[in-house]
Design a protein with these regions (language model features):
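Juxtamembrane/interfacial segments at transmembrane-helix boundaries in multi-pass membrane proteins
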Residues: 57-79, 179-237, 242, 267-287, ...
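Alpha-helical multi-pass transmembrane bundles of energy-transducing inner-membrane proteins
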Residues: 116-123, 127-215, 229, 302-315, ...
Length: 523
């Protein structure tokens, strides 16, 4: 049926252009219709994206599928080129799945400037889907930067008391990293033109450029810093707690579920295949594993002393992303697949936790853990949803959190057992900071009169949480369909890392001579 509709030829364009059309539709409509229009547009995008699960065929190998390319800026060799592999497939699905749930979760929260807010949410979806589906480096950078604008305004306008500070900090951190990446992109483009006579930003063309080990190391640093800030990993994480605490609930959901994944996706998409000699250099591997482990342990201990439930969950993101980083730089199939599964599980579970904390805030107008107690007695379904999601975040067997962390640790233990032992302690620390919060909020004595008035989940809230909880359990029980789709692409990335050899001086000289001869013939 999908082939009869020529689904592969237009779907990725639709997933980008439909929310963009929705953005203008929301701005044009009446204020009281904005949230419903945004929800409808995002649901249409999600329903269309579901077909990607069947359209992508892992039997065809780990390369890009559903590709399409349109000329954009021909003089620079820039194309509007889109495609998916077994890595980006899940990031696109996570983005389209999370956006309508975040929008639906905002209905009781966003009261002012609704048209602007929901237009920005749809524009944010345009950016994140574009980041994960672009196969042209210039186009990737455009979408990467585009996501910065709507999130800045979402935090700065609809956030908490310190929203302006948090928004500016978020903007400056990520913009600085992006500028370094831009320098790296321009350098790669210039080297491709000088060495191969290629004027193209297409991934497949740029991968052919014979960069020296020194060039790869410097470019790795430029790209790695940009993505490390976006993840964020220790010590570039300080913008994240402020952004999460001050952002409105739907902003926190999208930030945790999707935007942070842009950084770790960048690690896999660019650092490993584009700069393989740097990526597998022992000093680089040691540095990245060390930063990942420090992030896991440090974030766990800081989370354990947080009085604010939302800030506690914000620090869990730093810990989970630490697991992703060590999985990626284990440089083996188990570690890389585990890191990708942690990305997916974290996106769903942490997004759900922020929604649940937002629901508690709507009822009690506080996020301080000490102000709660005994909520499970008056709101049993709310308590049940929170407990399940917290257990997923900890990594309980039978949930998506366990599968990802298990594979990650398995991959790390293969090559770096010392790092694996330290990282395993992070699983224990996760229980140390998460379970006391659950105990304090839901199962301590029901003493405060305000807590007796807390209502249970509404139908709208059940509709939001049910698919998230179901997906976390389904992935935990039966992860094979996900692993089968991502494994060929993971294998292809790792083959590129280990097959790469430093280009000899003779090779570079011969390439340059051929380029000069070609230019002379043309003249």
């Amino acid at each position: 049926m999908l082939s009869a509709l020529a689904y592969e030829s237009w779907i990725l364009h639709a997933l980008i252009w439909l929310p963009l059309l929705g953005t203008f539709h929301v701005l044009w409509a009446a204020e009281d219709r904005a949230k419903w229009l945004a929800l409808r547009w995002s649901l249409v995008v999600f329903v269309l994206s579901v077909g990607l699960w069947w359209a992508y065929d892992p039997a065809l190998g780990g390369g890009y599928q559903l590709t399409s390319s349109l000329p954009w800026i021909a003089v620079w060799g820039v194309n509007y080129a889109l495609g998916l592999d077994g890595i980006s497939l899940f990031m696109v699905l996570l983005s389209t799945f999370t956006t309508p749930l975040a929008i639906l979760g905002s209905f009781n929260y966003i009261k002012k400037r609704q048209k602007a807010f929901y237009a920005l949410m749809l524009l944010l979806e345009v950016g994140v889907v574009g980041v994960f589906s672009a196969v042209d480096l210039f186009l990737f950078y455009v979408f990467f930067e585009l996501t910065l604008v709507p999130m800045y305004f979402i935090i700065g306008i609809w956030g908490g008391e310190r929203r302006v500070y948090a928004a500016i900090k978020f903007f400056l951190y990520t913009a600085f990293g992006s500028l370094l990446m831009l320098v790296g992109i321009l350098y790669i483009y210039a080297r491709g033109k000088a060495l191969l006579g290629v004027t193209s930003f297409a991934f497949v063309d740029l991968l052919q450029i014979p960069l020296t080990p020194q060039e790869q190391m410097w470019l790795f640093g430029a790209f790695a810093l940009a993505f490390a800030i976006k993840v964020p990993i220790f010590p570039f994480h300080t913008w994240l707690p402020d952004a999460h605490v001050e952002a409105p609930t739907p902003g926190s959901v999208v930030l945790a579920a999707v935007l942070l994944k842009m950084g770790t996706y960048g690690f896999v998409r660019f650092l490993l295949p584009f700069f393989p000699l740097a990526a597998r250099h022992p000093n680089v591997v040691t540095l990245m594993l060390t930063l990942g482990v420090i992030g896991i342990i440090y974030a766990a201990w800081v989370a354990a002393v947080q009085p604010d439930a939302k800030k506690l969950v914000a620090y869990t993101s730093v810990a989970h992303m630490g697991f992703v980083v060590i999985g990626i730089f284990a440089l083996n199939v188990n570690g890389l697949q585990g890191g990708l599964l942690v990305m997916i599980s974290h996106g769903i579970s942490t997004g759900a936790l922020f929604l649940l904390i937002g629901m508690l805030y709507e009822r009690r107008h506080t996020r301080l853990i000490k102000e709660f107690g005994g909520i499970g007695r008056v709101a049993p379904w709310l308590a049940t949803a929170f407990v399940i999601t917290a257990l997923v975040s900890i990594g309980l067997p039978g949930t998506s959190g366990f599968v990802g962390e298990f594979l990650t640790l398995l991959g790390v233990f293969e090559n770096h057992p010392g790092v694996g032992i330290l990282a395993t302690s992070g699983v224990i620390f996760a229980a140390y900071y998460m379970l006391p919060m659950v105990q304090s909020v839901f199962f301590n004595a029901l003493e405060k009169p305000e807590n007796r008035e807390v209502r249970d989940l509404s139908r709208r809230e059940v509709v939001i949480l049910a698919p998230m909880i179901a997906l976390m359990i389904v992935i935990g029980v039966h992860p094979t369909p996900l692993l089968r789709r991502m494994e060929p692409s993971v294998q292809m990335v790792l083959e590129r890392v280990y097959a790469a050899a430093p280009p000899s001086a003779a090779l570079i000289e011969s390439v340059q001579e051929e380029t000069v001869e070609t230019v002379e013939r043309v003249e």
